[in-house]
């Protein structure tokens, strides 16, 4: 009987080790669940009003920077299409190119300053923001002031192939009517393309003006709110007296 008891007690020896390993696995899973709950807790709990306002302002600023980059690229691309046509004031000024370049730089530097910080990036961001506003204003003035130039490019007699030096005399055969109609159709298509490109450029520059004014408006609103909060205790003290 003693040998049987010893034989039965021998395989029961590693049982505490198996229980200990199982306990460690459960504690690791519990830590993982607790860590996930702690990460999800800020998302589930309601945020304070100050934090939500700051987050809203940051989203508006990021949206304005993205708009500056996208609209700057669009301005450069549309400005490149102007070189299809003959020489115009808007094309010769290079307004779409330098306006788009300044807008892209302003948006990119604003994102870099948001990530890195620093006084130099802050100064460069302010300088490029002012430059983006100025260039967009100048480009809008140039584009709106010279919008009528398509009348001089696509004039009525552009498809007239009859020589003007021919002496007046007996009526002759008119030029090929099919070729004249085809030329007129192509000219009308180019005219519509030119007008649409100029209109899109004006729209892009107006949106750039709004995007460059948005950070300034947010800054003024923030200062106004701070001043209002400072003046509120003074008014309460005056009323109490």
Curated annotation (Swiss-Prot):
Cell compartments where the protein resides: Membrane
Keyword Phosphoprotein among record annotations: yes
Pfam family, one: CD20
Superkingdom, taxonomy of origin: Eukaryota
The keyword rRNA-binding is assigned to this record: no
UniProt keyword list: Membrane, Phosphoprotein, Transmembrane, Transmembrane helix
Main localization (coarse): membrane
Cellular component, GO annotation: membrane
Topology of this chain in the membrane: Multi-pass membrane protein
Location of Phosphoserine modifications: 38
InterPro entries listed in its UniProt record: CD20-like (IPR007237), TMEM176A/TMEM176B (IPR009281)
Membrane-spanning residues: 65-85, 93-113, 127-147, 193-213
The family this protein is said to belong to: Belongs to the TMEM176 family.
PANTHER family on file: LR8/HCA112, TRANSMEMBRANE PROTEIN 176A
Oligomer and partners: Interacts with MCOLN2.
Protein name, UniProt field: Transmembrane protein 176A
Species name: Bos taurus
